[in-house]
């Protein structure tokens, strides 16, 4: 019994120490409408969808320090999307956006995209 518990602790400690804490990406809500890995027809969902109560105009907030790596618009898939390269090398994707800022600026101090 001690061995499995010890193995669990060996796994748990580095996981907790290396865990990254990100900011919540919007002021819309903290409710999810879809989660990562949900099965969809012929594919798995590749993100988290946040409930916006069918309203637009909420802020998209950068989850961590980094820079805007790519901005795209497509008629299917993500629609209006911003890719942010984070300081830890990961990429945050802000998809299904209603619009981009009118003045085209990024406010890094407030972490608002």
State each model region's role.
Residues 4-15:
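Sec-dependent N-terminal signal peptides
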Residues 18-91, 99-103, 107-111:
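Surface-exposed, glycine-biased beta-strand/turn segments
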């Amino acid at each position: 019994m001690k061995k499995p518990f010890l193995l669990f602790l060996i796994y748990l400690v580095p996981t907790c120490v290396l865990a990254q804490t990100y900011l919540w990406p919007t002021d819309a809500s903290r409710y999810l409408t879809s989660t990562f890995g949900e099965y969809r027809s012929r594919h798995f969902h590749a993100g988290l969808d946040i409930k916006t109560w069918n309203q637009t105009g909420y802020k998209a907030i950068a989850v961590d320090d980094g820079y805007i790596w790519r901005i795209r618009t497509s008629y299917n898939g993500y629609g209006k999307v911003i890719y942010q390269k984070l300081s830890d090398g990961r990429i945050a994707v802000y998809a299904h956006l209603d619009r981009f800022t009118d003045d085209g600026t990024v406010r890094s101090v407030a972490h608002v995209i």
